[in-house]
Amino acid sequence: MLCISVGPRADQPPDTKDTLSNIAEMGEFVINIVSLPLSNAMYESSGTHPPKADEFEKAGLTPAPCEVVAAPRVEEAAVSMECLLDRVLQLGTDHLVIGRIVRFHVRDELYENGRIDVAKLQPLGRLAGNYTKVETIFELPAEDF
């Protein structure tokens, strides 16, 4: 299972975003993990675009076919997850989208011993409107609770 939050932009009216409309209409979606080399393309695709705009083209990215879902994945993404929609929960003005991952796409050079090498992936994230990249990987000892 996987979940994402889709909410209105602070600078826009609280209408349904194209992302949420597309997921609800299609019943499926793709999550592409953004790594540092794709940061500018991610930022470009996060802007406000007309509903039928080609965001792949605007961001300089290549759509690639998926194996299970109809939606395209980002060819340049090091990790992509094809998902089937389980449900959407409205929480205030935000929506929690819950999906079941049905297919992973992972670049060979990132996959070691049955796991994704997060240090090589260099994933990006959002924290309170700012961006962050994973730089330090560490383990904590397992505890019995």
Regions found by a protein language model. Name each.
Residues M1-F145:
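Basic, polyanion-binding surface patches
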